[in-house]
Amino acid sequence: MGFSDKQQKILQILVKEKEGITIEQFSKILEISRSAIHQHMTVLERDGYVRKSASMQTGGRPGTTFVLTEKGIHIFPKHYSLFSEILINLIRQKLGSKGLIEYLQELGVSLSETKKQALKDKPLNEKIEMAVAIMQELGYEAQIAKQNHTIDAYNCVFHDLAFKNEEVCELDLSLLSSLLDSKIKHVCCMAKGDKCCRFKVLPDDKAKTDH
């Protein structure tokens, strides 16, 4: 994602001005023409970083304000991984590694609760297809593997965290186990050097996970 200097300044202004800014206001702040601002806003709106909001009066003339979209907000640095690592370490210190695993398993089950009802009473193959779609919604590059009843994920949404704390994988296993009401075998793991994370669904033994 490449932004010009002016586009970066526009985004930086909008992250501070939650109620939005008009083209007229941008023109005054950045000291460039309204037509130049309009061109930048057209590009940013087209690419999904800003959107038009309410109209407001600016210097006697009505103007449409622009605000950041969720996509626009997410370009700014966040420190979720640092926060998550501190949280994981604190839980391990208080509960031990076993307690951390149990906590992550509970988290996986909780994550599945809003989605699980849609999979109820479906054939296993259909459940697996739906579970893959749910994983994709959560940010995984997941697909059904060639092997029967197997899911491959080619990225890890907890990448750095999982590489430093292998217990984090329990969340994935618990999520899939709860969604599919089946035992899940963690066949391959990127945190251990494999090319993907591979999850084998074992339909005969319910609601357990297995490395």
Question: Where in the sequence are the language-model features?
Answer:
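Short, charged/polar, Gly/Pro-enriched secondary-structure boundary elements
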Residues: 71-76, 158-161, 205-211
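A general alpha-helix detector
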Residues: 25, 83-90, 110, 114
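Basic, Lys/Arg-rich alpha-helical nucleic-acid-recognition elements, primarily the DNA-binding modules
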Residues: 1-70
